[in-house]
Amino acid sequence: KKDAKWSNGDEVTAQDFVTSFEHEVDPTSKSQIASDFKYFKNYNAVQSGKMKPSALGVKALSEKKLQITLSKRQPWLNDILASKGYPINTAAFKKYGSKYGTSSAKTVTNGAYKLVNWNGTSDDWEYVKNTHYWDAKNVKINKVAVQVVKEPGTAQNLFTSGKVQETALSGTY
């Protein structure tokens, strides 16, 4: 998308998708979705460690143009790209390395919201409107507070009292 930007103001580029795909397929990342990209050229060699992730069949042809080379036809490629083909902010990923995404301070997003007030282990955090989002003017909710509640009784009480708008309840409640 031409106007897509990261929450830090950087433009989303084709290289951000390359970085993401290479990271997902890199065996050291232990990604649970790596096999979704098994039809990308050199997937098996990269997954087995015989080739570097940079040998994967993805290449940024320009700032906004991405080339994906497949080892064989994949009829559901569009579905996979729409649901699993998320970019990673390349500059932030290089800066934070394995710590990227481990806290809100080390996470850069490109959606309607950015993650704040999460330290990587806390049970609550917030999503605040991303002012750099391409369609920010149509994002009507400025902040979403998330709280993980581990006890079903507590969740039910919070919901009943109106302190939370949504919760998962067990059959007991």
Task: Name each model feature, range by range.
Residues 16-18, 33-91:
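Surface-exposed binding/hinge segments that line
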Residues 12, 16-23, 38, 53, ...:
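Extracytoplasmic/secreted proteins, especially bacterial periplasmic and envelope-associated proteins
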Residues 2-8, 54-56, 144-145:
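Second-shell loop/turn segments in exported
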Residues 132-173:
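Ligand-site clamp/hinge motif
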Residues 1-33, 67, 161:
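Aromatic- and charge-enriched surface segment that lines or borders ligand/interaction sites
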Residues 3, 17, 22, 63-64, ...:
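Solvent-exposed coil/turn segments that connect beta secondary-structure elements
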Residues 70-139, 143:
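Gly/Pro-rich hinge or "lid" segments in bacterial periplasmic/extracellular proteins
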